[in-house]
């Protein structure tokens, strides 16, 4: 009888402590100001949604409020670290969509294409190319690390077959768009550091190998191996995949830039929508920030106009994602002007640019993962 009474008291005490702890966390969550950004994850955090009856009925409000609570929960970074530690002890090799590969190599999962968006994008690109019959239109899809560095994948990992996905896109685009294959060249160098260990981007070395493979299609002739010299600009880069997975946060990597050895490198970069100009393709101030990859062009912008002193008369329209940012410096000696558009941020249409900038060539340069989940290309390339 006495033992039963003691057990009930203990159970009640545990219940009271649990309720008080939960109540304390709720109070702290109300008092502590919301954070705008997670430095550890290198992303913006969800903000408190505005209440509207229509969004409540549709379920949109509940979804956004849940995301808000997940992002703004007090001690989130600490709990996240604890979860990663427990997962690793339990043998998990996949954390928040990131494979934890051999020798600490992090590899982002291969995205599955949204069939409707992909079909709309391909249709828009084909229609655009057919409407510009006198201008060469080229497509260069860059395979993601999980597709190339298959020797670094954890055992039993079975990512989507991105090679097959590329083949389907190439077939659907048909002859109206010239396909530039860089996958073969990157696979030849898979044992070299062509992708960062802690980030989803290729390294500048990987971009250079791709440039060498693409050069003949772009009308760039000769041996390019001795025409650029590399310089290290950072040895403390810790990329997005480390932030996303919570793994290898202490890993430090080198970022290199490649500079032409012979050509005149004078140029002007016009950040059209931002209303600013630069005489460099690099923004060294970004090396003091978390995402040091943004040293290339200062990060992503909606529209750039790069004017060079090249003797060439060619004017390139480059439609791209962030993989192109470290690729563009290889192109500048060979084009008089390069107009760079990122459809994720650009609100106009391509037809607005073709005549204004007297474009003579068009190149699409995307990583596979970005291309297969993109829902912006079809809008930007809508043929009027």
Where are these regions (language model features)?
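Extracellular glycan-modifying ectodomains
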Residues: 1-384
């Amino acid at each position: 009888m006495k033992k039963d009474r003691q057990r009930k008291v203990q159970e009640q005490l545990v219940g009271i402590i649990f309720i008080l702890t939960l109540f304390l966390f709720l109070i702290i969550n109300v008092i502590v100001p919301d954070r705008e950004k997670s430095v550890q994850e290198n992303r913006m955090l969800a903000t408190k949604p505005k209440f509207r009856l229509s969004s409540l009925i549709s379920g949109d409000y509940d979804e956004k409020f849940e995301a808000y609570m997940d992002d703004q929960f007090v001690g989130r970074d600490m709990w996240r670290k604890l979860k990663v530690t427990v997962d690793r002890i339990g043998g998990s090799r996949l954390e928040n969509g990131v494979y934890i590969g051999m020798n600490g190599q992090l590899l982002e999962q291969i995205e599955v294409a949204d069939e409707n968006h992909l079909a709309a994008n391909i249709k828009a690109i084909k229609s655009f190319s057919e409407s510009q019959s006198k201008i060469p239109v080229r497509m260069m899809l860059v395979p993601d690390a999980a597709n190339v560095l298959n020797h670094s994948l954890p055992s039993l990992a079975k990512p989507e077959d991105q090679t097959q996905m590329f083949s389907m896109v190439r077939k659907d685009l048909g002859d109206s768009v010239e396909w530039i294959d860089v996958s073969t060249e990157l696979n030849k160098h898979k044992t070299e550091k062509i992708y960062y260990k802690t980030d989803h981007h290729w390294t500048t070395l990987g971009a250079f190998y791709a440039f060498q493979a693409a050069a003949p299609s772009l009308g760039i002739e000769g041996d390019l191996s001795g025409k650029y010299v590399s310089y290290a600009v950072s040895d403390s880069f810790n990329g997005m995949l480390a932030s996303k997975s919570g793994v290898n946060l202490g890993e430090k990597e080198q970022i290199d830039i490649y500079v032409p050895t012979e050509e005149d490198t004078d140029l002007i970069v016009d950040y059209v929508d931002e209303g600013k100009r630069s005489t460099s393709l690099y923004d060294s101030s970004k090396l003091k920030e978390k995402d040091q990859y943004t040293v290339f062009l200062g990060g992503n912008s909606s529209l750039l106009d790069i004017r060079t002193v090249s003797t060439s008369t060619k004017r390139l329209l480059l439609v791209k994602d962030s993989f192109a940012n470290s690729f563009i410096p290889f192109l500048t000696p060979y084009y008089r002007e390069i107009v760079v558009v990122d459809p994720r941020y650009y609100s106009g249409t391509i037809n607005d640019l073709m005549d204004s900038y007297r474009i003579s060539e068009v190149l699409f340069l995307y990583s596979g993962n970005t291309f297969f989940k993109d829902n912006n290309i079809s809008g930007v390339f809508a043929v009027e």
